[in-house]
């Protein structure tokens, strides 16, 4: 997935150089970083927003997104369990819901979990991962390799439909789970394994082409 992203960014930079105003050093550095190590799911999300911005001829937005990609590509994120809020995700709170809505072809309305929900969710996720580790250390390692972040979110009161879990090709490495559903570690185990399988299938879908 990372190599495919780097290849596509190379193409975007080549065909849109005048509008993107890419510095060669920034391009080379970002592509090298993306190919070399894990990157935030937000890098993938910004890539799609970059393409959407060019399609709409919003060149200022495209330039800003490119600068953000360059900056984020330098970071090597570790596996983490995060709440769906601006303190943890910043502008990705809006981006994640919007891109998930595109893929689901319906509006996904998420909100930050209540404090007590978040505490239970994090404890459940930590316990589930420990149980997987005890049963199959290689599988636990694979989860941590494929998933960058497990994000606990709640369904907004304005949402038309609920959700149990969600992941997206456009946000590779991020798994969103409903904090209201997964406060038991066995349920959490099943959810983590299911959504991790999606991450693997996203990657394999490129290999098979």
Model-identified regions with their sequence ranges:
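Active-site recognition of the HExxH zinc-binding catalytic motif
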Residues: 190-202
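Catalytic or ion-translocation cores adjacent to nucleophile or general acid/base/metal-coordination motifs
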Residues: 202-209
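Auxiliary, metal-adjacent structural segments of Zn-dependent hydrolase domains
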Residues: 100-171, 181-182
